[in-house]
């Protein structure tokens, strides 16, 4: 993705920002000169996150320009990040100051191990109260799953209009998705279909209908987006943000609009309990949750939750309003679902 093009879209989003001044009593006050100076003495902040490198780089550059503090960024999946931080915590040699990734793993591991420190900065006032966790603070973005399609292969009129339309036999062999015997997010998505259909029985019937289409099963949703964008398959189960990600590259990608429910995952950012650079970490959390960082993320298609900021995707406001957090499962429940879906999709 070209840096010049990315910042062009970001600039347009920045022009439309609205700042909310109402706050909540328990938030930290605006950052003091003392904190800024202490953070500058530390000189760096180490961040483990799941944002794509180009998006994170734009955010990190903004922070570095504003404060003169270097950001060292490591990108990984939620599983990789949590495993690494857990290992470091256990060894008493924490290298990371900040973690940001999907909400459920962060909640689970914090309850089990106490890996994180509570810090809710003044920039959190720009989020709806219902999206603010008492410990972690705002759910800063939602990674939302829908159905994307290649407009050169399927016209908007021909595209599915509902979950029921997706399992029409005419899409047999023409849809790609994450492999539900391998890909965590796809497993979570399928296991949450009761939130779409209102009952587990109807959800199970729909899942079997999806499997009957003999979808192309891939390692994750990233290659699903690639295959749809390239025209290898016309339809895919993937992140709605790919409409913007691939559209910016000239690919004719659209998504099924107007669904009653869009499932997905929330994301948190938190300081580690033993952060080597705690002052720089606080400063980074405040910046990350602020309007500038949110605009950068929205500009490349992310569904950020700071009020009034949307990605440049048609119908984005409806997607946000229709978002439902995917179900959380215990390890045993997850493994059971994984085996169940392996059997269903291998028939």
Annotate each PLM feature.
Residues 11-26:
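Bacterial N-terminal signal peptides
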Residues 104-109, 229, 234-254:
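A ligand-binding cleft/hinge motif common to bilobed small-molecule-binding domains
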Residues 146-153, 190-194, 265-280, 296-299:
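A bilobed periplasmic-binding-protein/Venus flytrap-type ligand-binding module shared by bacterial periplasmic
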Residues 311-347:
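Extracellular/periplasmic bilobal clamshell ligand-binding domains
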Residues 29-46, 64-65, 168-170:
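Immediate post-signal peptide segment of exported/extracytoplasmic ligand-binding proteins
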Residues 129, 142-145, 170-181, 206-211, 217-218, 288-310, ...:
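Periplasmic-binding protein-like
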Residues 46-60, 72-89, 94-232:
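Extracytoplasmic ligand-binding site segments that recognize negatively charged/polar headgroups
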């Amino acid at each position: 993705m070209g840096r010049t093009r990315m910042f062009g879209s970001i600039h347009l989003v920045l022009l439309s920002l609205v700042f909310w001044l109402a706050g909540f009593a328990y938030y930290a006050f605006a950052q003091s000169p003392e904190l800024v100076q202490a953070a500058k003495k530390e000189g760096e902040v180490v961040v483990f996150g799941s944002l794509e490198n180009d998006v994170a780089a734009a955010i990190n550059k903004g922070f570095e320009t504003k404060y003169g503090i270097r950001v060292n960024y490591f990108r990984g999946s939620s599983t990789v990040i949590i495993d690494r931080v857990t290992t470091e915590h256990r060894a008493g040699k924490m290298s990371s100051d900040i973690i940001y990734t999907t909400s459920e793993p962060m909640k689970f591991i914090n309850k089990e191990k106490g890996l994180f420190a509570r810090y809710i900065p003044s920039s959190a006032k720009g989020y709806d109260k219902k999206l603010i966790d008492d410990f972690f603070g705002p759910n800063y973005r939602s990674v939302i799953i829908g159905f994307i399609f290649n407009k050169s292969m399927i016209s908007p009129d021909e595209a599915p209009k509902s979950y029921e339309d997706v399992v029409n036999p005419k899409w047999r062999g023409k849809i790609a998705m994450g492999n539900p015997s391998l890909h965590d997010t796809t497993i979570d998505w399928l296991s949450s279909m009761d939130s779409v259909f209102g009952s587990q029985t109807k959800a199970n019937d729909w899942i079997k209908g999806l499997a009957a289409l003999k979808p192309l099963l891939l390692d994750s949703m990233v290659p699903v987006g690639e295959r749809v964008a390239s025209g290898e398959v016309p339809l895919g189960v993937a992140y709605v943000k790919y409409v913007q990600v691939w559209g910016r590259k000239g690919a004719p990608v659209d998504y099924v609009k107007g669904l009653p429910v869009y499932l997905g995952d929330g994301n948190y950012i938190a300081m580690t309990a033993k952060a080597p650079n705690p002052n720089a970490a606080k400063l980074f959390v405040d910046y990350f949750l602020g309007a500038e960082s949110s605009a950068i993320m929205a500009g490349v298609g992310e569904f950020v939750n700071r009020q009034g900021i949307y990605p440049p995707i048609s119908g984005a406001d409806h997607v946000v309003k229709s978002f439902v957090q995917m179900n959380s499962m215990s390890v045993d429940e997850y493994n059971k679902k994984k085996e169940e879906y392996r059997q269903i999709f291998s028939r």
